[in-house]
Amino acid sequence: MKNTTLYTYRDYFVIRGGKPLTGKVKISGAKNAALPIMFATILTEEPCTITNVPDLLDVRNTLLLLRELGAELEFLNNTVFINPSINSFITNQEIIRRMRASVLSLGPLLGRFGRAVVGLPGGCSIGARPIDQHLKFFKEAGADVEVREGYVYVNLKEKRRVHFKFDLVTVTGTENALLYLASVPEESILENIALEPEVMDLIEVLKKMGAHVKVEGRSAYVKGSENLKGFTHSVIPDRIEAGTFMVGAVLTDGEILLENARINHLRAVVEKLKLIGGEVVEENGNLRVFRKESLRACDIETQVYPGFPTDMQAQFMALLSVAKGKSRIKENIFEHRFHHAQELNRLGANITVRGNTAYVEGVERLYGSEVYSTDLRASASLVLAGLVAQGETVVRDVYHLDRGYEKLEEKLKKLGADIERVSEL
């Protein structure tokens, strides 16, 4: 694995606000598509090549996990080459605890070996993020499931067709089920599945491997194979990174050309951005984003895709904190996902949280201060706020950002931001 500098947990950003973001930026591949696709390689014994893979902590931890399981791999210039000579069904607990997506090893390990031992996952601390739907599916598939001492033990008696309906829409639950069912020769049915672009990207990979997958509404019909093939695939662009830069353009009153962004993945974000005062124009496959009118209040409610994404809620809160009027943001996907509200208030925002709703009264300006990141998207909102805050803003614990944004400060610098990463050894 070709090495690039991995940042430390003590890194922080120093931002001097007041400069508009102008220029062009290339959007990286989607982490949330890359991770399940990398786990899909467990299902085959043939070589796999994945391009447009972002160089992030979660990606590197996934590669470490695959290597621990026996895979031979190389990560070079955003391309992953994997020879999945997997010889173990027991995952490394230390790696597992670093990221929530590690639970996606369950499905393919069970598909390949008929059993799996996976540590309970880590990642962002956003309320309750249980894996009960994953385990319920595996039980329905005929597996014995036991959770003890921080591990999930899954043993399969025999592979059989499954007809399973999720109690709620879950992205990783859908992906785990698809990864397992790709190895089951009989046709299975999943109901109430997630339809996120990242899920659809995984389905495209499973089709390349030899599985037959048909999606109708929120149902998926899956007929797998016990001889899945290797594949070559390019990961879709990161719609959340694109959305973050879109907010940055409108918030700072700049103008950004987003390369490698797909507007069809961003309809709900574009709709709200325009209501607030932004403009998004398609140009030769790219997106030009700028502020068209004075910022105004807007109500937002997070929903499963194709609704407004929970992963853009924090960034829009930063934007609405300086928009004229009173806005209401209702969070329906995760509980306790308003930690950034308190930190934005340190910068002078006027935000009140009641239950799963935040009430944002726009202020004339924000002022620099020291703030602390609590999760990936909260970190992004604080950086965005720092870009327009008067004076100097220090954003602590930016290791959260390194889990989901590739070279964020470098991209912001190229757009004109005054931002510096400081490492405390």
From Swiss-Prot:
Question: What EC identifiers does the entry list?
Answer: 2.5.1.7
Pfam families named in the record: EPSP_synthase
Domain of life, per UniProt, equals Bacteria
Any idea which residues are catalytic in this one? C124 (proton donor)
The GO annotation for biological process reads: cell division; cell wall organization; peptidoglycan biosynthetic process; regulation of cell shape; UDP-N-acetylgalactosamine biosynthetic process
Q: Name one GO cellular component term.
A: cytoplasm
The entry's localization annotation reads: Cytoplasm
Annotated pathway? Cell wall biogenesis; peptidoglycan biosynthesis
Q: Which GO terms describe its molecular function?
A: UDP-N-acetylglucosamine 1-carboxyvinyltransferase activity
User: Which residues of the sequence carry a binding annotation for phosphoenolpyruvate?
Assistant: K31, N32
What does the sequence similarity comment in the record state about its family?
Belongs to the EPSP synthase family. MurA subfamily.
* Database matches in HAMAP family: MurA
Q: What protein does this entry describe?
A: UDP-N-acetylglucosamine 1-carboxyvinyltransferase
